[in-house]
Amino acid sequence: MSRGALIVFEGLDKSGKTTQCMNIMESIPANTIKYLNFPQRSTVTGKMIDDYLTRKKTYNDHIVNLLFCANRWEFASFIQEQLEQGITLIVDRYAFSGVAYAAAKGASMTLSKSYESGLPKPDLVIFLESGSKEINRNVGEEIYEDVTFQQKVLQEYKKMIEEGDIHWQIISSEFEEDVKKELIKNIVIEAIHTVTGPVGQLWM
């Protein structure tokens, strides 16, 4: 039995990640695919993250970084098991978000990546570009919904994309929604059909 593919959607806040994930979920047989999003706010770490994001509690940046990382590690075994059972996972945010947001706040990218080292490695990361309209919508109640901060996050994403050690697909914000939907669906289907070998380890 061939394994499932680990496909991650990344991008700035309000870039359309969840919408595109749901489009994929509707396009592929339900018995072969599952959706997972981070942070998972139902766990102990997730509830602490939710309190932080919604400004109910404050933590120093190092603690916040570790909380987000721990939240992903809580699901590392689940991800590995699902992939080995032939289930493809569509993941809304992953380690790259954690590293980009931490680095945008001044943390060492190298150190932040070391916390995530060993997580299941994605077979494909789809990065949704944000147009000026989407970026300017980044004003909201949660702590990271700030235009200036989101621009910093974007620069950190670009650094990771340029490293070339991960298979990234950048989706332009210039595409019409129906074109974007079809393009992403085709990219995902190809990734599922061409995945080979054991699940890799991220940043090892």
Swiss-Prot record:
What Pfam family is a match, any one? Thymidylate_kin
A GO biological process of this protein is: dTTP biosynthetic process
What is a single molecular function from GO for this protein? dTMP kinase activity
The keyword Methyltransferase belongs to this UniProt entry's keyword annotation:
no
In terms of superkingdom, the source organism counts as Viruses
UniProt keywords (A-Z) are:
ATP-binding, Early protein, Kinase, Nucleotide biosynthesis, Nucleotide-binding, Transferase
Pathways per UniProt: Pyrimidine metabolism; dTTP biosynthesis
Catalytic activity line of the entry: dTMP + ATP = dTDP + ADP
The record's induction entry says:
Expressed in the early phase of the viral replicative cycle.
The answer to whether UniProt assigns keyword Cytoplasm to this entry is: no
Its family remark reads: Belongs to the thymidylate kinase family.
Q: What does this protein do?
A: Poxvirus TMP kinase is able to phosphorylate dTMP, dUMP and also dGMP from any purine and pyrimidine nucleoside triphosphate. The large substrate specificity is explained by the presence of a canal connecting the edge of the dimer interface to the TMP base binding pocket, canal not found in the human homolog.
Task: State whether it acts alone or in a complex, and with which partners, per the record.
Answer: Homodimer; the dimer arrangement is orthogonal and not antiparallel as in human enzyme.
- What protein name does the entry list? Thymidylate kinase
Source organism of the structure: Vaccinia virus (strain Copenhagen)
Please name the taxonomic classification of the source: Viruses, Varidnaviria, Bamfordvirae, Nucleocytoviricota, Pokkesviricetes
